[in-house]
UniProtKB/Swiss-Prot annotation:
Gene: isyna1-b
UniProtKB keywords: Cytoplasm, Inositol biosynthesis, Isomerase, Lipid biosynthesis, Lipid metabolism, NAD, Phospholipid biosynthesis, Phospholipid metabolism
Principal place of residence: cytoplasm
Similarity-based family: Belongs to the myo-inositol 1-phosphate synthase family.
Protein name per UniProt: Inositol-3-phosphate synthase 1-B
Function: Key enzyme in myo-inositol biosynthesis pathway that catalyzes the conversion of glucose 6-phosphate to 1-myo-inositol 1-phosphate in a NAD-dependent manner. Rate-limiting enzyme in the synthesis of all inositol-containing compounds.
UniProt keyword Isomerase, yes or no: yes
Length: 563
């Protein structure tokens, strides 16, 4: 895939195989010294390498025959084929609305006519979702065309066009251990792998190998979109270390199907993403991923109600309002809702949906004291009639000035699988991109990859999995900015800080006239005609930093900034 633009900078080099970028990572260290809070700006020099060649990517879905699996497969096929269909409201055309990379934009910089926006996907060379190759497993034997019909998600005219393609697709048998999911799933389980746990893991590994061999893909990413499981206890000697987990599988001890799939994927060198709320990544699974330098990510796709919660809570707390009560009610009628009607499976979902507000509460000690947080209640009910059209109702009550109260009530109708499917694509595309990014600091001898626990995926997950000791961030825009700014760093570009100082001065320090360099040499395909790259004269960056020459600046009597 050719780059849609090029960065003209002595700090960025477009080599044959990689984009090499020098980047200054600026942070702020805060510490206490003799009763004074000191603030010290810090800068670390990085060099990023991003491989330019985009691989042929295979995606294996656990639960391929479910609502999500059939919908995302159908969506990719429909986009690849350029399908359109009629509904009662008119003609519809296949698209990827809801995908961060395919349907949202980022500000590249400023040009002669203002800010220049490009599709998120064009920042770095990325896999085109139309080129994805799908395979997977399911405990149900239906081919994907019949499973798509059972799901009742897509319009009938579209299903008719897709049937000739999808009826040829049939999931591989999957692992079924009844005690981990609701008993009401038994009637689907006619397509299972038999044998010991060790034999089942070996069969999954053989399936991955077979898919690689027969499809000709360069990489495989495995994604769990099957039923929500109950939580597993962390048991010393069973799943607390990588070696104990492997022994537990050999000895047939308690290991969940999702963890078994994760182990098989890791041993095959394939990234594994958990799209459900259960604790798939027990300590032993995380250690195994780190040992094999394989990416893992999760947990639980963030699509509807929880995504809104991560935005609204961020808004309320950032505005200085104090949310004191959050009540979230859902009812849905798809198989996910059916499985979640069992108490143990619901508990897994309740935990992932409840923790989404924690970091925003902890960010404001003015509003919340130690151990104080809003009352937070989550309810999910199964109502078969509504199918995949999930209803979500939320009530947010906040304390406002002088003892007042503010209540916000939302009603949200979520087409569950149509919201989740674009997130699948973003997860696998971002994971694959991260596999092609390496970096080092000025003191490192060798380049390194991201940590095996791929926390950059947090934007797409309800309960972000992060490396030990890492802060968990749920706030929507902080998560999105993290992805955008890391990708900008790979191009040697400063983070977007939205200061726009050049427009806030009587005498601007930067000329907004067209630069002498022909910026139109790099047209942006998403716009009519030629676009321009954002222009910054030499020596000027988005982040403006200078010293007053005194060595330190005193902000107040007890806070100092050291330059």
């Amino acid at each position: 895939m050719a780059e849609m633009f090029k960065v003209e900078s002595p700090h960025v080099r477009y080599l044959k195989d990689v984009i090499e970028a020098d980047y200054s990572y600026d942070t702020t260290q805060v510490y206490e010294e003799k009763g004074v809070t000191k603030v010290k700006p810090c800068s670390t020099k990085f060099t990023f390498h991003t491989e330019r060649k985009v691989p042929k990517l295979g995606v294996m879905l656990v639960g391929w025959g479910g609502n999500n699996g059939t919908t995302v497969t159908a969506a990719v096929l429909a986009n690849r084929l350029g399908l359109s269909w009629m509904t009662k409201t008119g003609k519809k055309v296949a698209n990827y609305y809801g995908s961060l990379f395919q349907s949202s934009t980022v500000c590249l910089g400023r040009g002669s006519s203002g800010e220049v926006f490009v599709p998120f996907r064009d920042l770095l060379p990325m896999v085109n979702p139309n080129d994805l190759v799908f395979d997977g497993w399911d405990i149900s034997s239906l081919n994907l065309a019949d499973a798509m019909f059972r799901a009742e998600v897509l319009d009938w005219q579209l299903q008719e066009q897709l049937r000739p393609y999808m009826e040829k697709m049939k999931p591989r048998p999957s692992i079924y251990i009844p005690e981990f999911i609701a008993a009401n799933q038994e009637d689907r389980a006619d397509h299972t792998i038999h044998g010991t746990k060790a034999e089942q893991v070996q069969k999954i590994r053989e399936d991955i190998q077979d898919f690689k061999r027969t499809s000709g893909v360069d990489k495989v990413i495995v994604l769990w979109t099957a039923n929500t499981e109950r939580f597993c206890d962390i048991i010393p000697g069973v799943n607390d270390t990588a070696d104990n987990l492997l022994k537990a599988i050999e000895n047939g001890l308690e290991v969940s199907p999702s963890t078994m799939f994760a182990v098989a994927s890791i041993l095959e060198g394939c990234a594994f993403i958990n799209g459900s709320p259960q604790n798939t990544f027990v300590p032993g699974a995380i250690e195994l991923a780190i040992r094999h330098n394989v990416f893992i990510g999760g947990d639980d796709f963030k699509s509807g109600q929880t995504k809104i919660k991560s935005v609204l809570m961020d808004f309320l707390v950032s505005a200085g309002l104090k949310p004191v009560s959050i009540v979230s009610y859902n009812h849905l009628g798809n198989n996910d809702g059916k499985n979640l009607s069992a108490p143990q499976q619901f508990r897994s979902k309740e935990i992932s949906k409840s923790n989404v507000v924690d970091d925003m509460v902890q960010s404001n000690p003015i509003l919340y004291g130690p151990n104080e947080k809003p009352d937070h209640c989550v309810v999910i009910k199964y109502v078969p009639y509504v199918g995949d059209s999930k209803r979500a109702m939320d009530e947010y009550t906040s304390e406002i000035m002088m003892g007042g109260a503010n209540t916000i009530v939302l009603h949200n109708t979520c087409e569950d699988s149509l919201l989740a499917s674009p997130i699948f694509l973003d997860l696998v595309l971002l994971t694959e991109l991260c596999q092609r990014i390496t970096f080092r600091t000025e003191t490192d001898q060798e380049f390194q990859t991201f940590h095996s626990v791929l926390s950059i995926l947090s934007f797409l997950c309800k309960a972000p999995l992060v490396p030990a000791g890492t802060p968990v961030v749920n706030a929507f825009f902080r998560q999105r900015n993290c992805i955008e700014n890391i990708l900008r760093a790979c191009l040697g570009l400063s983070p977007q800080n939205h200061m726009m100082l050049e427009h806030k001065m009587q005498r601007s320090f930067v000329s907004l006239k067209r630069p002498s360099v022909d910026c139109n040499a790099y047209p942006i395909s998403s716009k009519k005609g030629n676009g321009v790259n954002g222009f910054h004269p030499p020596g000027i960056s988005n982040g403006l930093s200078h010293s007053n020459g005194l060595g330190k600046t005193v902000i107040s009597s007890d806070i100092e900034i050291e330059n």
